[in-house]
Amino acid sequence: MAKEELIELDGIVDEVLPDSRYRVTLDNGVVVGAYASGQMRRHRIRILAGDRVTLELSVYDLTKGRINFRHKDERRSDAAPRASARRR
């Protein structure tokens, strides 16, 4: 059986909810509930309110999505680079 087609959309995280869930407003104005993908959880990528994200929606339920990418924030580009941790 072939995997179903997913719809990829961009949006902005409005609110961080309990249990690793998020409320995201898509670029077209629709508000959906979302969760972080397994890769993002495994690599401990933090998602905060105001972050720009890409999510996948199933064609069967357009109210829930999976966040699979957090875009780089242009505002943080002027911050000093993090000092490397030294092992002893």
Swiss-Prot record:
- Gene designation per UniProt: infA1
**Which UniProt keyword terms apply here?**
Cytoplasm, Initiation factor, Protein biosynthesis, RNA-binding, rRNA-binding
The record, for CDD domains, names: S1_IF1
Q: Could you cite one Gene Ontology molecular function of this protein?
A: ribosome binding
Which NCBIfam families does UniProt cross-reference here?
A: infA
Tell me which residues make up the S1-like domain: 1-72
- Keyword Calcium annotated: no
Q: Where in the cell is it found?
A: Cytoplasm
Q: Does the keyword section mention Repressor?
A: no
By sequence similarity, the record places it as follows: Belongs to the IF-1 family.
Q: Which SMART domains match?
A: S1
| Assembly and interaction partners | Component of the 30S ribosomal translation pre-initiation complex which assembles on the 30S ribosome in the order IF-2 and IF-3, IF-1 and N-formylmethionyl-tRNA(fMet); mRNA recruitment can occur at any time during PIC assembly.
Q: Name one GO cellular component term.
A: cytosol
Report the superkingdom from the record.
Bacteria
What name is this protein filed under? Translation initiation factor IF-1 1
Q: What does this protein do?
A: One of the essential components for the initiation of protein synthesis. Stabilizes the binding of IF-2 and IF-3 on the 30S subunit to which N-formylmethionyl-tRNA(fMet) subsequently binds. Helps modulate mRNA selection, yielding the 30S pre-initiation complex (PIC). Upon addition of the 50S ribosomal subunit IF-1, IF-2 and IF-3 are released leaving the mature 70S translation initiation complex.
Report the Pfam families cross-referenced here: eIF-1a
